[in-house]
């Protein structure tokens, strides 16, 4: 099987489905505005059994001291049989991570 990962040049971006929930969470907790991309998974790819479509997002943090500096926090990838399912799964995972990270960072001040 070939190694496959979503590439930026093949992605289509969306702000539909539940992406507005993710945008709200990113704005509230000071993350860069999210760009959720999706693409079709090739039939020869190792991850095709996870679903026909892939949604992906890289979460960037924003420094409070340098307004233009963004650092990579983590990346998310979700697979499903439809674009809507993949994007909704990705949004759920990302919002859950953002709220969990906020709670854990508050524990330490």
From Swiss-Prot:
Superkingdom of this protein's organism? Viruses
Q: Which InterPro entries match?
A: Corona_NS2
Give a single Pfam family match: Corona_NS12-7
Per the similarity annotation, which family is this?
Belongs to the coronaviruses ns12.7 protein family.
Q: What is this protein called?
A: Non-structural protein of 12.7 kDa
Please name the taxonomic classification of the source.
Viruses, Riboviria, Orthornavirae, Pisuviricota, Pisoniviricetes
